[in-house]
Curated annotation (Swiss-Prot):
Classification via Gene3D superfamilies: 3.10.450.10
Listed name of the protein: Antihemorrhagic factor cHLP-B
Signal peptide: 1-19
Expression sites by tissue: Expressed by the liver.
Function: Potent inhibitor of hemorrhagic activity but also proteolytic activities. Inhibition occurs by formation of a non-covalent complex between this protein and the proteinases at their metalloproteinase domains.
Native organism: Gloydius brevicauda (Korean slamosa snake)
Amino acid sequence: MNSLVALVLLGQMIGSTLSHHLQSHVDCNGEDAEKWADMAVHYINEHNLHGYKQVFNVINEIHVLPRRPRGKIIILELKLLETECHVLDPTPVENCTVRPPHYHAVEGDCDVKILHDEGVDKVIGAKCHSDPDSVEDVRRNCPKCPILLPLSDPHVVDSVEYVLNKHNEKLSGHVYEVLEISRGQHKYEPEAFYVEFAIVEVNCTAQEAHDDHHHCHPNTAGENHIGFCRATVFRSHASLEKPKDEQFESDCVIFDVKEGHAHSHLIEHHIGNYNTSPGHNNTVLNLAHSHNHTSASHESHSHEHVAEVPVAVAKREVPTNTPHDHTHPVKLCPGKVHHFKL
């Protein structure tokens, strides 16, 4: 019994010590908070292997922990939103359009660790979990708006292949293959399937590209041509076969990947596999929002090892003692909504 009491007291002492060192009262709308959030999103976009570039929407919480022998660890809890720029798009994220709610927006919850040492801040890790807005909410606000489909849906895959074949037929001496399917939606009135996908130029002829026994490869480093396509393929309600002569609208933009481009390594990551982005409702760094419930788990951490208090204890606790003054404390978090709330 005495041992049990001693263990309880020891736990209370440790908890009290951690609570004392944990600084939770950081203004989520302050200049430092905004600077840290921008740094975190830049890090996430640089390490994103799939899907779309992100912007931060809300700073949910900030925790500051001591780090031995010096410095501190800053833990940000962020909500991000998907833009319309694919990760391979060289457009600066500041110039990318945030995907609006009526296009079935996707939100990410991210925990980001930042090391602050001798006046220098450095992101040392990030973990993100993404979810699309619910179908019910989309339909409640816009009954006829397009709804996200699993990227493995046959209509999505067939539409991508159909549009890419049509695109290759128009080109002379250039053949492209799919790098990644990143979005698929079902449209209504008229019935159609909307798709977005990344492509890369390969060293095959058109005939070789249709040969299942021939393996195409991207052009040599420094000569890669990558692009991104948005397309709508119109289908009848009863049509379940692969599209043949359906009407379609497409817009494919081709980028030149310069040697040393930050994302040139992604081509080798993708090519050789028929890729869809990883699924949502999983812990993923890349926030790729494939909406296909596939299993994916990616975390990013620098190789630097830091001594820190475990993240699991970095949660704000409800005080056990009620303060005697009757003034209402200023609510510092969450911060303001920068775009819209899902």
